[in-house]
């Protein structure tokens, strides 16, 4: 439903195996706890309900060497943001360093799984750069990348785009129509639409973004100015808004009443 959810779903791992294991020993503290050997391989984010510690997220660059799963260990001083943060953690700068573990777990679940695409969404003001890397770490569903090493845009209409490999003359088709997707068994639908950012005759290189969903990405902050990367996009984390919070008897615990009317 969102690029972030796609990235976090692809990086989810569990110690219980492909079909799961419901024996009591698979839910022990030794399985749920965070071990020092996980540093540089797994992020600290996990669910805060019954899945705590059972389902985990790999970091952006987990250092997996091959399909067998062999991992190259690194010393703590050799680690950087890519080796330390999962995608959600990298999209929440400063929070992961200062929040308590329970708040971090809540942020992971609520940010990656409950986030919705809205028209007035914008990138974060303070980032680690992960919001700009996200389009290249996910599929073409929300940001379509050029699949050829060298290519040229042959045709652009309101419904489709055609890209041609300059060497082999192979063509790639990009659907620009509005598509409707269902939220699995959640019972509601979302719409996505890729809008082109290239013109007929424009030359492209591999992984150049040619079209993107404007609800998911934008270049509104930082990378859209003069001299910036014309293909540079940032993930829209949410709506930037000024909010006034007043504690009254209408609130419950850490909740508050929300109204469209502004005073």
In which residue ranges do the predicted regions lie?
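Long, charge-dense accessory insertions within large macromolecular proteins
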Residues: 1-48, 52-202, 206-262
């Amino acid at each position: 439903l969102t690029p972030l959810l796609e990235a976090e779903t692809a990086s989810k791992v569990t110690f219980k195996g492909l079909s799961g294991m419901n024996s009591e020993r698979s839910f022990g503290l030794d399985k749920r706890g965070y071990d020092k050997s996980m540093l540089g391989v797994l992020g600290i984010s996990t669910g805060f309900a019954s899945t705590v510690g059972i389902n985990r997220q790999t970091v952006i660059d987990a250092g997996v060497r091959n399909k067998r799963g062999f991992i190259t260990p690194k010393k703590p001083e050799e680690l950087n943001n890519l080796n330390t943060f999962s995608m959600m953690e990298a999209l929440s700068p400063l929070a992961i360093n200062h929040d308590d573990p329970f708040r971090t777990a809540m942020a992971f679940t609520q940010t990656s799984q409950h986030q919705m695409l809205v028209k007035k969404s914008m990138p974060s003001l303070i980032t680690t750069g992960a919001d700009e890397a996200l389009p290249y770490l996910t599929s073409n569903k929300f940001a379509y990348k050029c699949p050829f090493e060298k290519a040229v845009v042959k045709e652009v209409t309101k419904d489709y785009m055609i890209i041609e490999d300059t060497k082999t003359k192979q063509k790639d088709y990009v659907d620009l129509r509005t598509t409707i997707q269902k939220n699995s068994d959640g019972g509601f639908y979302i719409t996505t639409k890729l809008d082109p950012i290239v013109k007929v005759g424009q030359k492209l290189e591999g992984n150049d973004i040619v079209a993107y969903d404007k609800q998911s990405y934008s270049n509104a902050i930082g990378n859209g100015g003069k001299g910036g990367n014309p293909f540079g996009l940032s993930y829209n984390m949410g709506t930037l808004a000024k909010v006034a919070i007043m504690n009254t008897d209408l609130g419950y615990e850490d909740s508050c009443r929300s109204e469209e009317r502004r005073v």
